[in-house]
Amino acid sequence: MTDTDIKSHKIEFPCVDYPIKVIGDTSAGFTAAVMEVLEKHAQVDAKTLAERQSSNGKYTTVQLHIIATSEDQLRDINSALRATGFVHMVL
């Protein structure tokens, strides 16, 4: 991959339909904790919310779209989600 290829894959801000996928332990407060963090840091499109459990029920995936305004905002979201203690991965 060349430098040109890498630069062409950068996100252009603002990105009005930025997908966020959060994977964490299944618990009663997981989705609410994810939504609370996201709503604190970004404008969230709640209509895009999708929630799915793993086949054994141990993990839950929450997926939705936000309006992403900067790389700093995305880093802050990632840090805040991980700080909840529920989250294993943010994609």
UniProtKB/Swiss-Prot annotation:
One of its GO terms (cellular component) is cytosol. Transmembrane segments: none annotated. Gene3D superfamilies: 3.30.70.260. Belongs to the UPF0250 family. This is UPF0250 protein PSPTO_4820. It comes from Pseudomonas syringae pv. tomato (strain ATCC BAA-871 / DC3000).
